[in-house]
Amino acid sequence: MTTNLEELGRSPEEQKIFEKIKQRRSQMLVHSCLYYELDTAIVTDDQWQKWADELTQLQKDYPNLCENMGWYDDYFRDWSGATGMHLPHRDPWVLKTARYLMDNQNFTTNTL
């Protein structure tokens, strides 16, 4: 099923930004789970921080796209990007995705 962007009130450019915010949130969730819950890392601290800084800036620049986004909104509201310690590492989707990446890291490094 395709989504009509006009129905969502988003331009194609806004949709790209929305998807980038969702991607960066996903990366913060999964890689924080790997680090804090599973005691491993498949990206460097510098790479994680680069993604965190980009997400912080995107959320600052486009707050209208982050309101009621439906992707872990409460955890990223007023998020500074300083740490992922408070994120929901034991959330079923987060944990499953982190374990998948850990098990397949030779094929997926730096992707999610």
Regions found by a protein language model. Give the residues of each.
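Phosphate/adenylate-binding "loop-and-lid" substructures adjacent to NTP/NAD/dNTP-binding pockets
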Residues: 1-112
